[in-house]
Amino acid sequence: MLNRVFLEGEIESSCWSVKKTGFLVTIKQMRFFGERLFTDYYVIYANGQLAYELEKHTKKYKTISIEGILRTYLERKSEIWKTTIEIVKIFNPKNEIVIDYKEI
C-alpha cells in the first residue's frame, strides 16, 4: 500500500478540531543533508477514541512515533487540496504499541 506512513518526531503543537471530532498534532522533524539542516513539519490527526489517546500521549511525551495513512482533503477557506496523516497506531518511546486503531 503506497499511502502507509511511519513517522517520528518532536511534538510542536496540538489542538482539538473546531467541531471537537478530531485531535490534531503538528510534528517537527530535523535532519541533515550534508552540512545543511532541514526542518519539516507534518500534521497528523485522529478521530473518535484514538483522538483521546493521542491527546493523552501529547500531554505525557515530547516526541511521538506513529503509523498512519495519507489522506487528502479540500480546505474550505482557501479551497486548496492538502494532505495530512490519519493515525492508525501510536507507539511509546520504547516502540511498543500504545494504541492500535484496529483494536478499538
Swiss-Prot record:
Taxonomic lineage from the root: Bacteria, Bacillati, Mycoplasmatota, Mycoplasmoidales, Mycoplasmoidaceae
Pfam families cross-referenced by the UniProt entry: DUF3217
Domain of life: Bacteria
Record protein name field: Uncharacterized protein MG376 homolog
